[in-house]
Amino acid sequence: MSEDSSALPWSINRDDYELQEVIGSGATAVVQAAYCAPKKEKVAIKRINLEKCQTSMDELLKEIQAMSQCHHPNIVSYYTSFVVKDELWLVMKLLSGGSVLDIIKHIVAKGEHKSGVLDESTIATILREVLEGLEYLHKNGQIHRDVKAGNILLGEDGSVQIADFGVSAFLATGGDITRNKVRKTFVGTPCWMAPEVMEQVRGYDFKADIWSFGITAIELATGAAPYHKYPPMKVLMLTLQNDPPSLETGVQDKEMLKKYGKSFRKMISLCLQKDPEKRPTAAELLRHKFFQKAKNKEFLQEKILQRAPTISERAKKVRRVPGSSGRLHKTEDGGWEWSDDEFDEESEEGKAAISQLRSPRVKESISNSELFPTTDPVGTLLQVPEQISAHLPQPAGQMPTQPTQVSLPPTAEPAKTAQALSSGSGSQETKIPISLVLRLRNSKKELNDIRFEFTPGRDTAEGVSQELISAGLVDGRDLVIVAANLQKIVEEPQSNRSVTFKLASGVEGSDIPDDGKLIGFAQLSIS
């Protein structure tokens, strides 16, 4: 009978899958173990909510078809996919060893990381397999875009496979994935994200995966990405403004890093070069001296799988076996339960979809579904509301010598604004707008004052910055840095009434950056 069941095609009938424990979750999806009765095999099902995606199913199916043609021992096998109500179910191979992140957390929880989380041989063995998978993807025109320990899975035999590519990224871009080799979509996890992906200026290619690979190497040694303690906006600012991170970045106890040698550190520094052209390819990295330390899968089986958490230890039990309807959501105590009610806006899943961080003044913003959640499809054009565009300054050629005063809608008194913000600003009830002025030079090198309002609980720093760029007031390269400093002010208005910061767009020709004269710099203040 086993031979007969293995010859059967994978079912696209929801009733043929018995959903079991939750084995992973993110902002937009839940992964559950499941038993496929016709195949007599346990699988993993990734359930992605399509309700807010508005992606063309024709385009989506084309991408799934391309993904299903990926066959490589270091890429998780996708068996089939189908739609259940407002969810896309991806059926894939279940790797019982879990993710490398599961193992990292397990080691740290047991206090066995004082001299580094994983040793060099283990890291080299895991990462060599990851490189094999990345080389395959890159040769086939695919960019993974979210390489990290949480997306590196282990089989019970010590095999290593990369998961979570293709459709996940496809959904996050609103269906705007083409077969071009350069992307401009903003997808990925901030701590692992390459600078060129953050900037959204030149576009990026497969070298973005190499940066993420370097961050992952640090994660396997230290237990976390370098800037993991910081909020997303701060991560973006640190990545763009600072020198590339190293093994030591953010690590307080340097003793834990003593056992890591020069070849490992050199490999990391090669990956973490801000200029993507200087980074090696996956094929070139495979020839690096560090990977001579790599061993076989039996080594991983013996070295880490025997002390890894079991699938039952990793799992989050579902409180009620679901029927054909209902929603899965996380409860306050971290458990999972099914609800037959309409979308629960108070659940974690609901919050992700409702997107509390979204700016209503921007109809559809280009964003990262994890970093800047929105309820609209991603990758569509921005539209500036009439009430704002009516107050925009004149074109650059008509700018006066003195800073242009751009008067936006009436503002609240600064004192009241600061008081409101310091006493619980972010609540939906407290919608007192904060008046701000952004002073920077235009393309004619003339100072320009841009006045606008920010309403806590309604606006987001990223959304407002997008409006300024859409209106032609701010260079697109400065999106992240303007948003980061706006966030800094609205979070702590009393201590940050005015900030001066360096622009990512830099200066032209022979100009010398000057923070006093705002050459290559900008100033953001509460007015």
Curated annotation (Swiss-Prot):
Its cofactor is Mg(2+). Residues 334-348 have a biased composition (Acidic residues). Its main location: cytoplasm. The modification N-acetylserine is found at residue 2. One of its GO terms (cellular component) is cytosol. Residues 315-360, 392-427 are annotated as: Disordered. The modification Phosphoserine is found at residues 324-325, 339, 347, 359, 427. Residues 17-291 form the Protein kinase domain. InterPro entries: Kinase-like_dom_sf, Kinase_OSR1/WNK_CCT, Prot_kinase_dom, Protein_kinase_ATP_BS, STE20/SPS1-PAK. It holds the Pfam family Pkinase. Phosphorylation at Thr-185 by WNK kinases (WNK1, WNK2, WNK3 or WNK4) is required for activation. Autophosphorylated; promoting its activity. Activated following phosphorylation by WNK kinases (WNK1, WNK2, WNK3 or WNK4). Residues 399-408 have a biased composition (Polar residues). It comes from the Eukaryota. The keyword Acetylation applies. The keyword Metal-binding applies. The modification Phosphothreonine is found at residues 185, 310. Effector serine/threonine-protein kinase component of the WNK-SPAK/OSR1 kinase cascade, which is involved in various processes, such as ion transport, response to hypertonic stress and blood pressure. Specifically recognizes and binds proteins with a RFXV motif. Acts downstream of WNK kinases (WNK1, WNK2, WNK3 or WNK4): following activation by WNK kinases, catalyzes phosphorylation of ion cotransporters, such as SLC12A1/NKCC2, SLC12A2/NKCC1, SLC12A3/NCC, SLC12A5/KCC2 or SLC12A6/KCC3, regulating their activity. Belongs to the protein kinase superfamily. STE Ser/Thr protein kinase family. STE20 subfamily. PANTHER family: SERINE_THREONINE-PROTEIN KINASE OSR1, STERILE20-LIKE KINASE, ISOFORM B-RELATED. This is Serine/threonine-protein kinase OSR1. It comes from Pongo abelii (Sumatran orangutan). The lineage of its organism: Eukaryota, Metazoa, Chordata, Craniata, Vertebrata.
